[in-house]
């Protein structure tokens, strides 16, 4: 088939200059403010892992604080290593790779929609919708794995959809499909393979037929491509670490994370059923229109089949086929693409908002289909959509200038460590009091005290602190303490303390032997 979805004629063509300006604005927005302090527990840890690999010139073994860190594959760390080499070790470099992956996701959406519909204007509108989607913008700005796996998954699905749109006449789209599955395996592990294969299987269930012969034959040379790409990291990791790698990375970080709440991220089954829609803002209304039309069409055809069916099994099967083959193949692929990650992560024992990001892409494509059709009929809707996209960018920029820096001051220890360094304490060890500060992983610059298992050491009492400073009488210690607990340190007669600074949430305290 030459195209796998159709649009009503009469849609206005948007000037080319507008799309060029919007693309430039998108690039600006996605890189703006990447120098802000690293936030949350994950960004500093992943940035520190990349730095340690960079400083050792080691592209294989991820470490945190010098201890093996087998939580995730290496793609994000590789991006950080390259960025550190170019820009130095800083926040911008840590986030540069994810920002590029965000732009890569948008470009993949454009290519997918362009080749699937032979309609460049629709492709432009789809890219606009993807670029201005809150979920994609937010996760493209963080040094984390969610957008890093979303890009190759999107590129892989683009390869398959382009292959379908060209009636399987070329092998290059399938080469891209298999290549980017390999990249996705390097980005976040086994879901890089499970999701594309699962999506294609579900899509063929929707259309009620087997994959074409050319695609099935391609598996014989496609899986070797996947293996070669993935083996660039998995093979040397196994050769270097053996069964330890298999146990920690495959068994614990994949199967135990999915089957249990070992990593303490529990949420109800329906968690992603409301997180996913929120991530599609500001295009949620158009996604709901698409979903509503699909449900109404399905119910209408079910009723029609029920009225004409003679009750036989053959009639029932034919009815299912009729229901499934009347809607756009692109729409069906997108629904399969949404459902596989949605159901997979809903069944998982561990749930974090970013997990569902791969499903945001097909959701916004479904919204873009409705937007393109409606804006072609109504100048008001056209202006409304353009205004919403630009307004989203304006809100993001204003937030990064006026809101996020104030929030970041209370959420990062960057300023606290900088104050201690400026006071001449830049070589002192750092530890937490009662609680650990994961934000310090990056900013403490290798000075964190650690337990034998590699975790940050936390002093549980003032007496324990006294034992440490007595043992190391010639060297003070920097303590990061929640502000409400600082009085336990300052009021104690067991140690000498000096509160260097606080950020409203955490204080950094110099602790000496009394």
Regions found by a protein language model. Give the residues of each.
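Membrane-integral, polyisoprenol-dependent glycosyltransferases
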Residues: 2-377, 403, 441, 446
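N-terminal signal-anchor/signal peptide hydrophobic helix marking the start
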Residues: 17-18, 383-391
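Noncatalytic linker/hinge segments flanking ATPase motor cores
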Residues: 63-65, 225, 264-275, 289-291, ...
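Membrane-interfacial segments at transmembrane helix termini in multi-pass membrane proteins
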Residues: 371-385, 411
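Core SAM-dependent methyltransferase catalytic element
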Residues: 507-514
């Amino acid at each position: 088939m030459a195209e796998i979805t159709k649009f009503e004629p009469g849609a206005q063509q948007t000037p080319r200059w507008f799309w060029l300006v919007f693309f430039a604005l998108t690039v600006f927005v996605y890189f703006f403010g990447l120098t802000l302090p690293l936030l949350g527990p994950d960004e500093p840890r992943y940035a520190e892992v990349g730095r340690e690999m960079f400083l050792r010139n080691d592209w294989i073994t991820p470490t945190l604080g010098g201890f093996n860190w087998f939580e995730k594959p290496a793609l994000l760390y590789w991006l950080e290593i390259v960025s550190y080499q170019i820009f130095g070790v800083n926040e911008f470099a840590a986030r540069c790779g994810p920002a590029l992956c965000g732009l890569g996701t948008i470009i993949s959406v454009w290519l997918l929609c362009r080749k699937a519909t032979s309609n460049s204007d629709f492709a432009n509108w789809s890219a606009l919708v993807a670029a201005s989607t809150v979920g994609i913008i937010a996760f493209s700005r963080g040094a984390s794995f969610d957008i890093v796996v979303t890009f190759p998954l999107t590129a892989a699905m683009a390869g398959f959809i382009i292959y379908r749109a060209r009636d399987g006449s070329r092998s290059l789209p399938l080469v891209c499909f298999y290549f980017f599955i390999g990249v996705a395996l390097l980005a976040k592990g086994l879901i890089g393979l499970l999701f594309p294969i699962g999506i294609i299987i579900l899509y063929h269930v929707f259309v009620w037929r087997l994959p074409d012969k050319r695609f099935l034959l391609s598996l014989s040379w496609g899986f070797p491509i996947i293996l070669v790409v993935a083996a660039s990291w998995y093979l040397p990791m196994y050769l270097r670490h053996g069964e330890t790698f298999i146990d920690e990375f495959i068994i614990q970080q994949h199967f135990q994370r999915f089957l249990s709440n070992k990593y303490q991220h529990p949420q109800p089954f329906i968690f992603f059923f409301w997180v996913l829609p929120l991530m599609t803002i500001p295009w949620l209304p158009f996604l709901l229109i698409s979903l509503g039309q699909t449900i109404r069409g399905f119910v209408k055809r079910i009723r029609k089949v029920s009225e004409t069916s003679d009750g036989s099994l053959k009639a029932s099967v034919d009815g299912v086929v009729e229901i499934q083959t009347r809607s756009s193949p692109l729409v069906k692929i997108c629904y399969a693409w949404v459902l596989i990650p949605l159901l997979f992560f809903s069944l998982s024992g561990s749930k974090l908002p970013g997990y569902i990001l791969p499903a945001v892409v097909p959701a916004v494509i479904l919204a873009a289909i409705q937007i393109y059709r409606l804006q072609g009929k109504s100048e008001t809707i056209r202006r409304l959509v353009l205004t919403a996209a630009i307004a989203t960018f304006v809100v993001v920029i204003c937030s990064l200038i006026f809101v996020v820096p104030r929030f970041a001051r209370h959420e990062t220890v960057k300023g606290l460590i900088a104050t201690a360094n400026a006071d001449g304490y830049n070589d002192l060890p750092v530890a937490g009091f009662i609680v650990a500060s994961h934000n310090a992983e990056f900013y403490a610059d290798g000075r964190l005290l650690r337990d034998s298992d590699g975790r940050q050491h936390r002093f549980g009492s003032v007496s324990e602190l006294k034992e440490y400073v007595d043992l190391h009488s010639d060297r003070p210690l920097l303590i990061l303490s929640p502000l409400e607990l600082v009085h336990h340190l300052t009021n104690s007669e067991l140690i000498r303390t000096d509160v260097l600074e606080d950020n409203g949430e955490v204080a950094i305290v110099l602790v000496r032997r009394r």
